[in-house]
Amino acid sequence: ATVFCNGRRVFHHGCGYTAFTVDLTEALRLGEKNVLAVRCDSREDLNIPPFGGQIDYLTYGGIYRAVSLDVKEPAYLRDIFIEAQAEGDFRIYTSTVGETVGCTLQAEIRSPAGSRALYDGELSLPIVGTLNGVHPWSIDHPFLYTLTVRLIRPGTGGLPDRVLDEKSTRFGFRTIQFVAGGLYLNGQRVEVRGLNRHQSYPYQGYAMPDSIQ
């Protein structure tokens, strides 16, 4: 897919099976009508997956998943990621964009029951901590926590602090190991079974709503 803004080519993404983000800031015209266009090309290219090997399904063209337009502050969170072990140890990584000098990060972990633990600190990474008494994620009991990270600019002159951006992701506390004997989840060997599911439907192809997927 190739993205154009006001006739200007701003981004090209060489795969139809992965998400991508485009920064339109430099191509936008403030106070005017802007035209955003996406050109999709489904011709076979041996350098772009899944082509280059044998496949047993059709590769349609077009946009068949959600597209959103996000309005951001000049400084914002590009991405957040958490590594969490079954014992409760965790490490949070973040990626920011823009001028973040003087800003702080606030990380909040919340369980499905609503209990939470707060971690505040200057913009130094990674954020490392431990939660006691966590419920490990497993296949039979997929217990998920929610991590929320906020980028905050402290207020000046009596003004309150301002949240510039906020991102959330769900995760589980678990330990996974691939060794010669197989796959081990939280120290227990597990058998992994899967299937190959194609999402092509008669008369609709891939363009089906979430309720049917």
Q: PLM features: residue spans?
A:
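Secreted/periplasmic carbohydrate-active enzymes, especially glycoside hydrolases
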Residues: 1-213
